[in-house]
Amino acid sequence: MSQAHDKTHLTGQDLVAMCVNDMVTCGAEPLFFLDYFAASKLEPKSTAKIVKGIANACKKSNCALLGGETAEMPGHYAKNNFDLAGFSVGVVEKENVIDGKKIKPGHILLGVESSGPHSNGYSLIRSILKKHKAPKAIMQVLLKPTHLYPAPVLELIKKTNVKGMAHITGGGLTENIPRILKKGLVANVDLSAWKFPKAFLWLQEKGNISTSDMLRIFNCGIGMVCILDKKEISKAQKILSAHKLRSFEIGTITKGRLQEQIQYN
């Protein structure tokens, strides 16, 4: 999709975001990033755009781009195809690791808005786009790079007592939130607490996707979930708002023995 719309330079931010957004959920600060770029033929202009996107995303995440590897592999990749990968290293004091062990019944789930589907669900998105032409406004959202959450989340951790966090990636809300919950806890999510963005509603309609499948495939407008005490929600929302991020009180933690540790209301 990015190639078809001349947006390959945005994939660099997607790459960095997938690493550093995962990292900050445990309270770690990103230190450095390394990338790998390979293609059948390296085109200097397009390669430079992608690397620039990576560098800019690292800068926004206060993460040094130490270096990386580029490889030209004729015959290994189809024409105009490329492979982009990377990894990041961060640091957090052992006693400050956020692992969800402090999550208790009564704690609140604060959902932080996403910029779009981020980097997940695109196999399904592409199949839908083969059958239906998306309006310009919808396509713009589908092509938006993944939000970089380190700056707002690390400030949130510094100024509030975050109990747990989930980066909503593959598996959507349904699979990512339960990963941080102890046995005996259930996340009760109120679907009326926020509205699915128009791009997700368009995908749901054109793809004939059930709401339960939407919640298991896409982030549905929520890119990060932070779990806090009720008394800290207002402060947390002000911090996120200062970073131009909307947030929603999307549910509560309760006791329960459900097979799935998430329930939608």
PLM region descriptions:
Residues 1-5, 122, 200:
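Short, glycine/acidic-enriched capping/hinge loops at junctions between secondary-structure elements
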Residues 1-115:
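Glycine-rich phosphate/pyrophosphate-binding loop regions near the starts of catalytic domains
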Residues 14, 29, 69-70, 92, ...:
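Gly/Ser/Thr-rich beta-alpha loop segments that engage phosphate groups in nucleotides
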Residues 27-29, 124, 161, 246:
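Short loop/turn motifs at secondary-structure junctions
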Residues 37, 100, 120, 237-240:
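Short amphipathic alpha-helical leader/targeting segments
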Residues 46-61, 77-82, 131-143, 147-265:
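Glycine-/charge-enriched secondary-structure boundary and capping motifs
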Residues 105-136, 140:
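Acidic, glycine-rich loop-and-beta core segments that form the ion-binding/anion-interacting portion
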